[in-house]
Amino acid sequence: MNQEHKIAIIPGSFKPPHKGHYEMIKHYSELVGPDGEVLVFVSKPSAKNQRKTPDGKVISPELVKQILDIYCQSLGNVNVEIAQVSPVKACYDIGERLKSGVLLFGCSKKDDDIKRFNQIKSYIESRNPNLIVLDPITTAVDVTASEDGVVSATDFRRVYGNPEEMMQFLPDHLNDGTKHKVIQMLLQ
């Protein structure tokens, strides 16, 4: 990558945030380097699009932000925000506003994640010729796997309420005390 200021934007629901989310954020943090920045946009879904735990609990965007801040504490170039519009729309908006630099969009190689960004490179470059937009396909991350398969928020929600099973979904770099704190935050 060239020496221009690099910004990675990672939109998503992150409900609940798990080790795969952290590994993706860490990947982009390393990719943009210490002088770059990573903006993580957490969705604020409408009532019909909320993701719920088996017992019907809604995981709030505010809780997601608090947990991602804990996960990313050691990553000095990461800022987690709650998106006021759809997180993908926030990506487009930032791409239009930036004056120059290199822009990356965070996504995984899982399912349809990359498809959210099919048009973004050409769209932003046509409106902002001073910006270099990297093709999301070239920077997409592999999905984090565990012994039981791919780590997903859906599977994390399935074990919600069972602290022992929830532990396997938390980032490996967290100590046990921090993992217990995160689980307590999720279960409150």
Task: Cite the ranges covered by each PLM segment.
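Nucleotidyltransferase catalytic core that binds NTPs
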Residues: 1-188
